[in-house]
A protein has these predicted regions:
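A short, conserved, highly charged catalytic patch centered on acidic carboxylates
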Residues: 3-118, 125-151
Length: 151
């Protein structure tokens, strides 16, 4: 196997190799992407959201842009509710990147723009789910991410 097993269910990805470069088919964007460790995590987490947590594919945005302190940044994944409001930001890291305070702070900075109620950080091995209360300026970590209808 090209990349290590993750702490997510295995999925039957469409992998290809062309000129020594591996690619993975992105089911949402309908195109082949260069297979990097971070992309491996992102594609697993997308499938986890769709198949396990019942998030509609049409309500997931991949690599959405945002402006933060006059700098153009990208969120890995954004989930929307059925009314088109952002409800979750997911920051994906390669399995070799430890989920640290710095990684969580990066996602929190992105959330200062989006103001979502769920903040998720994952490296495919460890997943941190935080429910944000913007009114109280606080958050609470959850062991498990609720199904889409309960977000």
């Amino acid at each position: 196997m090209l990349f290590r097993s993750l702490n997510l269910p295995p999925y039957p990805f469409r992998l290809t190799k062309k000129e020594e470069q591996h690619y993975i088919f992105d089911e949402i964007r309908k195109k082949h992407l260069v297979l990097t460790p971070e992309e491996w995590v992102r594609q697993h987490f997308i499938q986890y959201l769709v198949l396990e947590k019942k998030v509609p594919k049409s309500l997931i945005q991949i690599e959405g842009g945002l402006l933060l302190n006059s700098l153009q940044k990208r969120t890995d994944l954004v989930v929307y509710n059925r009314q088109g409001k952002r409800i979750m930001i997911i920051e994906c890291k390669a399995p070799s990147i430890k989920i640290s305070q710095g990684v969580f702070d990066q996602a929190a900075r992105y959330n200062s723009v989006h103001q979502v109620k769920w903040l998720v950080v994952t490296n495919g091995l460890q997943h941190c789910y935080a429910l944000i209360s913007h009114q109280e300026s606080s958050f609470k970590f959850w062991e498990e991410l609720p199904d889409y209808e309960n977000l």
